[in-house]
Amino acid sequence: MHMIIYLDTNVYCRPFDNQTQDRIREETDAFEVILEGIRKGRFITLTSDVLQYEITKILSPLKRTEVERYLALSKKRVEEKEEILKLGIVIRDRCGIKDRDALHLAAAIAGGATYFLTCDDGVTLATKGAGCTEKVAEEHGSGMKICNPIIFVKKEV
């Protein structure tokens, strides 16, 4: 069975960040391992309207083109519906997650993701962040887990 994962925009952009910092380099390496798993069919990636929107806002044409190429590997798209907007509001209000991040999380839950991967500490390490959002996911019939790509690779690859 294929595992469904949702990659936050910052994961797709990690290869273009300053690689002199250990954490950024490790997250980039983890992303490369995940990409290989996607190409081999082990993982199915979700995309969403909020993800597409954020990618259109990438200023560098080269970076945007490369990220769009990564995104083209996605096999499943979550259409923005009222249920996603409502769930995003619940996540924002209950868990203290920023609007766009809450919409990413809501799309991942609605799309049946097993994991939501992000490099954003505000999502993974916030006082109420991951645990709260995972509880909301559970309430909506999802066992989705939220973690950094490095942790995901250590657990699942």
Give each language-model segment a name.
Residues 76-127:
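Active-site neighborhoods of divalent-metal-dependent phosphate/nucleic-acid chemistry enzymes
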Residues 54-59, 87-91, 155-157:
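Short, solvent-exposed polar/charged micro-motifs at secondary-structure junctions
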Residues 36-39, 67-71, 134-143:
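Short, conserved catalytic or adaptor-binding loops enriched in Gly and charged residues
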Residues 6-61, 72, 147-150:
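PIN/NYN-family metal-dependent endoribonuclease catalytic core
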Residues 1-2, 18-25, 94, 111-157:
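Acidic, PIN/NYN-like endoribonuclease modules and their adjacent C-terminal/linker elements
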Residues 12-14, 45, 65-68, 82-86:
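A short alpha-helix capping/helix-coil boundary motif
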Residues 75-80, 145-149:
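Short acidic-hydrophobic, aromatic-tinged amphipathic segments that line or gate anion-handling sites
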Residues 30, 51, 63-66, 84, ...:
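Amphipathic alpha-helical interface surfaces
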